[in-house]
């Protein structure tokens, strides 16, 4: 692939990730729904999607996004991102999520498939060479305590809370 096309693809992917973040931050859930892949939209109606996100309002507040490494192969892309924000309920805490955003290109437009595990698994199974030079990682959640980022690890189902 010529360098100019690759750079253009990476730029388009970054632009899509930033646009989707701003839609989520501004609670523009209808537009956010339009950026989902066809497979996601076929499984969930716009009303159900919007309603689910509206129920989460007041629990967290997004503040900013850092976009890191972008890898594009054909109609697939993975982007390293860090989302910063605050948890407002049931406790107040500053937090960040280090997560890879998965995108698929459909009808010439990049669409974010990150929350759609079925699409992501299908994407990875169909493209085993994709993670060459780009390690696929699980999301990590951090909270700030005493000025330091501490990774939050929820108890597993086998652990008991005391």
Model regions and ranges:
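Short solvent-exposed beta->alpha transition segments
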Residues: 14-22, 26-80
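Exposed beta-sheet edge and beta->alpha loop/turn motif
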Residues: 72-162
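Repeat-mediated protein-protein interaction surfaces in helical alpha-solenoids
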Residues: 1-4
């Amino acid at each position: 692939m010529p360098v100019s096309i690759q750079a253009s693809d990476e730029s388009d992917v970054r632009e899509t990730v930033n646009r989707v973040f701003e839609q989520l931050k501004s609670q523009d859930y209808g537009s956010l729904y339009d950026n989902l892949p066809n497979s996601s939209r076929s499984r969930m109606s716009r009303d159900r999607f919007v309603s689910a996100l509206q129920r989460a309002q007041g629990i967290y507040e997004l503040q900013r996004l850092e976009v890191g490494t972008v890898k594009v192969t054909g109609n697939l892309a993975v982007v390293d991102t860090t989302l910063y924000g605050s948890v407002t309920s049931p406790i107040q805490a500053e937090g960040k999520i280090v997560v890879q955003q998965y995108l698929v290109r459909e009808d010439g437009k990049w669409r974010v498939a990150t929350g759609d595990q079925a699409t992501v698994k299908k994407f990875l199974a169909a493209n085993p060479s994709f993670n060459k030079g780009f390690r696929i990682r699980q999301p990590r959640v951090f909270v700030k305590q005493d000025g330091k980022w501490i990774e939050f690890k929820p108890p597993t189902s086998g652990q008991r809370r005391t």
